[in-house]
Amino acid sequence: MLVLPGLGADDRSTIAIRGFLERLGYQVRGWGRGRNVRAPDADVSAVAAQVAKLREDSGLKVSLIGWSRGGIIAREVARQVPINVRMIITLGSPFAAPGASNVRTIWRLLTGQKYEPPTPERVSRLAQPIPVPSTSIYTRADGVVAWRACVEQEGDERENVEVNTTHIGLGFHAPALWVIADRLAQPPGIWKPFHPGPMMAPWFPRSRRSSQK
């Protein structure tokens, strides 16, 4: 599997996620492309090629985990080469409204360049469901992106899981890591929605609210 960092971050930011998954016995790779500050289309093409090589070498479809902007790239890779992708898991990724964030300020600070917002056509495409199973992990206390922009159109093999942390905390938050592990543990070709169960439900705000109705 492949773990993609957020805007301005590199593989060092995903060490906790990758280390956690390696301890569970998975073969995990960082994206190996330095800081995530390039034009997204270039990254999508490069990661798609990387995914194709990983599948060729292993004979298995590749799961992609993307944090923030990395999740947007991961989803577009799945849209481009779904035959090579097993599932997508995103962490605080504003694919439903990519402009609903502090990205303009962050981009200018990181690159010294003016942020060029995506075209209406691209915004519309990013929000469309992808053709592989997907789980969006989000938090209402994000602080960087608007949480509603991270919410998927729920349907067959598409879901949203709410946790209680910050945008920066998503890659270290135990419940978020547990969701990732739970999703990856499903047998190939079989997908069921995430259910924390009564013991873990208090750690998941959406489940807690549902149980109180």
Describe each model-derived feature in a short phrase.
Residues 1-12, 16, 20-34, 38-133, ...:
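Serine-dependent carboxylesterase/thioesterase catalytic core
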Residues 79-213:
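Helical cap/lid subdomain of alpha/beta-hydrolase-fold lipid enzymes
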